[in-house]
A protein has these predicted regions:
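A short pre-motif secondary-structure segment
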Residues: 69-75, 109
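Conserved long alpha-helical elements within nucleotide-processing catalytic cores of c-di-GMP signaling
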Residues: 2-29, 36-63, 73-77, 81, ...
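Catalytic strand-loop-helix junctions within cyclic-nucleotide turnover domains
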Residues: 83-91, 106-108, 112-131, 155-159, ...
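Catalytic/regulatory signature loops of cyclic-dinucleotide turnover enzymes
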Residues: 107-108, 131-154, 169-180
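Short amphipathic alpha-helices in soluble, non-transmembrane regions
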Residues: 94-101
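Active-site core of bacterial EAL-family cyclic-dinucleotide phosphodiesterase domains
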Residues: 15, 162-201
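Beta-strand residues that line the small-molecule/cofactor-binding core
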Residues: 30, 110-112, 178, 196
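Interdomain signal-transducing alpha-helical coiled-coil linkers
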Residues: 9, 156, 160-167
Length: 201
């Protein structure tokens, strides 16, 4: 099937690096594809239908690779990647085409596909692996435009680092018993009776 024919992670990264090295004069984006709530898709329609969806996506991407000569890859789960021009119209065309794969025949639930983009020219020091990582960060940080296309910005990475730092600090504080728990009474202003408690940390 198509999933066995599409390049896996290491092969794709090598193909992508070779492609970018030989097409430096053109503007490219590395794109990560995300089927939003794919686990829910599996839950609703079964893993067989989920596997069929992945196979259909892989088939479309292999057709794209055959006609365009640009690398595509599959990293497992629902993680697909491709290289495409830094051109909004062509990017939107890809989203529309691939969306047909995830629009189910069942009309009760609609699933959407998103594209996370990392513009290669904006990150000249990044290798293929870093570009893919940035594209994955972008696809998980929707801009609420409704377009299904999310472009990487360094602020996304800064936000992830800040979140991780906060989680580390919270874990450290829990380990060292640095939180104090208080119960503040809530009183009826007329009867002055205690009617509840408010938890404060």
């Amino acid at each position: 099937d198509a999933l066995t024919a599409i390049a896996r992670k290491e092969d794709f990264l090598q193909h992508l690096q070779d492609f970018l090295d030989t097409h430096k004069t053109e503007k490219w984006c590395v794109a990560a594809i995300d089927v939003e709530h794919f686990r829910l898709y599996n839950e609703l329609y079964g893993t067989a239908q989920g596997d069929a969806l992945l196979n259909t996506l892989a088939s479309h991407l292999l057709d794209y690779q055959k006609t365009s000569g640009r690398p595509v890859g599959y990293w497992g789960n629902d993680d697909f990647f491709l290289c495409l021009p830094d051109d909004r119209v062509q990017q939107q065309d890809i989203v529309i085409t691939l969306q047909t794969c995830v629009s189910p025949n069942h009309q009760d639930v609609t699933f959407f596909l998103a594209l996370g983009l990392c513009p290669v020219s904006e990150h000249p020091e990044a290798d293929a692996a870093a570009l893919c990582n940035y594209a994955q960060i972008a696809v998980m940080n929707p801009d609420h435009s409704g377009s299904g296309i999310h472009r990487f910005a360094p602020a996304m990475l800064d936000s992830l680092k800040a979140q991780q730092q906060l989680l580390s600090e919270l874990e450290h504080a829990l380990d060292n018993h640095e939180f104090t728990f208080f119960l503040q009474p809530k009183c009826n202003s007329i009867t002055r009776a205690i009617v509840g408690m408010e938890a404060l940390v």
